[in-house]
Amino acid sequence: MIQLKENQGIPRSILLMMSIIAGLTVANCYYNQPLLELIRHDLDITEQIANLITVITQIGYALGLFFLIPMGDMFSRKKLILVNMTIAALMAIVMAVAQNVWMLWGASLLIGACSVIPQFFIPIAGQFSTPENKSRNMGFVLSGLLTGILASRVISGYIGEWLGWREMFFIAALVMVVCMGIMMLMMPEMKRNYVGTYRGLMTTVAEIFILHPSIRIYSIRAAFGFGSMMAIWSCLAFHLAQPPFNAGSDMVGMLGLCGIMGAVAASSVGKLVPRFGIHKFSLFGAAMQIIAWAIALLFGDTYAGLIAAIILVDIGLQCQQLSNQSGCLQEIPQASNRANTIFMTTYFIGGSLGTFCAGYVWTQADWLGVCIVGISFAFISLMISLSHKK
């Protein structure tokens, strides 16, 4: 078995494996988005109740980030990942057989919490890569994660339309079992970065948050960028179900292909961050999201307008996420999992807030309200970047 040493480099095979599994595991959090209209009809629930499935999944992810990712500094990361995969597979089966919304909500919470596996991988890429390749390799893993997000929407949209939404979650459980087998064969064990109690570990997370203002800035402005992006996806299925589209879940999935530009951008941003700097990329990303939402507001009743908005809001987010996450992990490399916990927990709180706000205003002001939420979140991110030079 290969042994990894800090700053000494990672074999390409391990990076590729982490990138692929990052995509397959994070997909668990996004299968539900194109299926919301189908679930709503099947269980006879309102749009706002159905939207909470996505909100609760994001909350679960944030909880997993906060309580589980710090353990990567204290326990075997390989074993933690395998346990999370097992629970995610079981909860996908619960989703598939759920007969009421309470089962869906409970399973969604645990699926979200146990799908944080990519956030073990990204610090691994940062910790063990050679210094000149850290941002590039983190971007490579992140591009796999983003490809998983966009592929999950496309695949679940089509499977939901032609086989049914429950079948999608049975398939998700099978995918997790396959990933477990690959992990057991390929993933090496890694040296732990912390010796002590779990309580002491979590205390250091709070200390890092208090003592490192740069980490707070990186995390909060990226969180508002993620909230802006989640606003469009949380209500897209409802928007497309209305005239002039009258489209099904397969069309929601097709629009997920637009996100491929975001995946491509992640790899490019990882190479360019050291040259142009974190601050410039964060500013650029927030500005691009504002432009995207202006297009969604003016041309959101056309496929061309929606496609342009989705592409731009996604590329804008990747510029914000990778640049700010890279800065966060480089701030304290010896505590990379804990720094990543702060960043990603804040990030997904922002995503949950964007999802909730968009879902609420959809019932009050339809697509106009969703666009206002998206623009507002992107504008806040822009203002934070303008008021801080890091």
Model-based region annotation:
Residues M103, F140-M187:
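Helix-loop-helix hairpin linking two adjacent transmembrane segments in secondary transporters
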Residues A107-G144:
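Cytoplasmic helix-loop-helix junction between adjacent transmembrane helices
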Residues L65-S76, V264-I278, W362:
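Helix-to-loop junctions at the C-terminal end of transmembrane segments
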Residues L80-I93, K280-A294, I375:
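Structural signature of the two symmetry-related core transmembrane helices
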Residues L63-V101:
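Conserved MFS/SLC helix-loop-helix module at the cytosolic interface between two early adjacent transmembrane helices
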Residues H279-N324:
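C-terminal transmembrane helical hairpin of 12-TM major facilitator-type secondary transporters
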Residues I117-S129, C319-I332:
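Intracellular juxtamembrane helix-capping segments at the cytosolic ends
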Residues I2-Q8, M187-I220:
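Juxtamembrane intracellular "pre-TM" segments in multi-pass secondary transporters
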